[in-house]
Amino acid sequence: MPFRLAVDYDGTLFQGSWPKIGEPKWDIINKVKQFKEEGAEIILWTCREGISLDQAIQRVKEVGLEFDAINDNSPSQKEYMKKKLEQGEEFATRKIFADFYVGDDAMNLDIFLSINVSETCRRFENR
């Protein structure tokens, strides 16, 4: 299963200015792009919904970010959950599973920026 990274929008990818769309935080955006290039699955993990979510999605596309899921589990996690259900295990949950949750509240962004992307993704490849 690939490394899964869940990233918040307001205050993390973009300056916090809810409900407005803030300015890009390029250091974080570029780090997320590095994870994507290394094969990680990227999840946009935000409390935004409706029109404000649509605006946020449009803005992340404009800065060149691609997400494997938006407020949902990654494709590999969904496949894993499907297999568990087929084996008779109860595996229904609304929880979004990720290896790292990056947000202005969840992880110090300076620590996130210091992570070695290649090494981190490689460590999670064979679990």
Model-derived segments and spans:
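Alpha-helical substrate-recognition element adjacent to the catalytic core
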Residues: 1-76
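C-terminal cap/substrate-recognition subdomain and adjoining C-terminal extension
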Residues: 41, 53-127
